[in-house]
Swiss-Prot record:
It is an enzyme of class 2 (transferase). The keyword Transferase applies. Keywords: Methyltransferase, S-adenosyl-L-methionine, Transferase. InterPro entries: COMT-like, O_MeTrfase_dom, Plant_O-MeTrfase_dimerisation, SAM-dependent_MTases_sf, WH-like_DNA-bd_sf, WH_DNA-bd_sf. This is O-methyltransferase mfmE. Belongs to the class I-like SAM-binding methyltransferase superfamily. Cation-independent O-methyltransferase family. COMT subfamily. It holds the Pfam family Dimerisation. S-adenosyl-L-methionine binds at G243, G244, D268. PROSITE patterns: SAM_OMT_II. SUPFAM superfamilies: S-adenosyl-L-methionine-dependent methyltransferases, Winged helix' DNA-binding domain. The gene is mfmE. Its EC number is 2.1.1.-.
Length: 401
């Protein structure tokens, strides 16, 4: 007698098709808030891992993903995303697109087909393609420059990582002047010096960092920033953004509290702060955070993504350089960074950790790691602020009296 249950785990054959249809109908607008959407993304990652066979995993990881990166880069170099966008992002045939970007149509079809197979483009019919929200986003530098950065930096570094680690006895990289980045790029000096000497790649890197800042939950969504105003001396500096790049975070604060602009300070190396987008009434200070902090007695000293660039010894020195400027019992240190869980870390956190390792010999720290680092530099951890919308958190610390 034939079985009537020939589906998934013995369920009726019609049920898997219904399940697949349900999955195909799920989109970002299926969720009431971004926290639920993020949880669904993680669940989808886990679902793929449960469904894939070993062969499907290696085919995707070892062929599909490298090929996707290359296809994205070729399309970027051809200015495909930008030129298509200028024409209104409508459906176009492969032949029309090949004329648009001056590329052999047979070659371009192979590129377009892989982009469509990975949902970067939509193939509406045979040989006809349409942009998606994702591909249109590549016309904006904070997304599009990630493709250049992939080939300028991350791919060369990860390609070199196994060889470098083997040659160095599999020791944890801690020297920002002698790591994977230097081996990959043939460079003497740290990554930041490299970008100063290579301004085109440096400008691309700035856009990448802008994308990091702009597309994660900001510190104002994580930390109760109003309490800084409620407890601040109106005549003293309010917030000092230490190593704040061109001012993405301090500008968010200024927009929320415009009356405080003259008491806000953006600090980074002189050549960086001169590119700041902040209004003139925000103070811009050229500052090397390995030297004593020049702005004294601020209510808060804020660091976003600074300390993960550095291993223990330099990170400790950066923290120590802020201490003399801080007013005991008043000044707060705010560290906005990844706080890796002891287990089951978010894949973005683990990816950041390995990226920091190969680029700058940095590290994404666990909570116990942060506590030990702060204590060694003369601070005590007051509280860790988190949000379900963010893989990063804000560590609130003060001087340990």
């Amino acid at each position: 007698m034939a079985s009537t249950t020939n589906g998934v785990n013995g369920h009726k054959a019609s049920q898997p098709q219904s399940l697949i249809q349900t999955l195909n109908n799920i989109g970002a607008d299926s969720f009431s808030n971004d926290g639920e959407r993020i949880q669904a993304v993680l669940a989808a990652y886990a679902l793929v891992s449960r469904l894939e066979t070993p062969w499907e995993f290696v085919a995707r990881t070892c062929m599909g993903q490298p090929a996707l990166g290359a296809a994205l880069k070729v399309a970027k170099d051809l200015k495909l995303y930008d030129k298509w966008h200028e024409l209104g992002d409508g459906e176009m045939t492969c032949e029309q697109l090949s004329e648009l970007v001056s590329c052999d149509s047979a070659l371009l079809f192979r590129i377009l087909r892989h982009l469509a197979a990975n949902h970067v483009l939509e193939e509406t019919s045979i040989g006809v393609f349409k942009p998606t929200k994702l591909s249109i986003s590549f016309t904006v530098p904070v997304f599009g420059e990630w493709i250049n950065h992939l080939y300028d930096a991350t791919t060369p570094c990860f390609f070199k990582m196994p060889e470098f680690l083997a040659q160095n006895g599999y020791k944890n990289p801690v020297d920002p002047n002698n790591g994977v980045f230097q081996a990959a790029k043939g460079w003497k000096g740290d990554m930041f010096d490299y970008y100063k000497s290579h301004p085109v790649e440096g400008a691309s890197f700035d856009h990448v960092m802008g994308g990091v800042m702009a597309n994660q939950a900001g510190w104002l969504e994580i930390f109760p920033h109003n309490k800084l105003l409620e407890t601040a001396d109106a005549q003293s500096p309010l917030v000092v953004d230490v190593g704040g790049n061109i001012g993405h975070d301090i500008e968010r604060f200024r927009q929320e509290h415009p009356e405080t602009a003259s008491r806000l300070y953006l600090e980074d190396l002189p050549e960086v702060v001169k590119r700041s987008k902040c209004p003139d009434d925000v103070n811009k200070v050229g500052y090397d955070f390995f030297t004593p902090q020049p702005i004294k007695g601020a209510r808060a000293y804020y660091m976003h993504g600074v300390l993960h660039d550095w291993s223990e010894e330099p990170a400790r020195k950066i923290l120590e350089m802020q201490k003399e400027a801080m007013k005991p019992g008043y000044s707060t240190l705010l560290i906005h960074d990844h706080i890796a869980p002891e287990s089951l870390a978010h894949p973005h956190t683990t990816a950041y950790d390995l990226t920091m390792m190969v680029m700058v010999a940095g590290v994404e720290r666990r909570e116990a790691h942060w506590r030990a680092l702060l204590k060694s530099a003369g601070y005590k951890l007051v509280r860790i602020w988190r949000s379900p919308l963010a893989v990063q958190g804000v560590i609130e610390a003060e001087l340990d009296q």
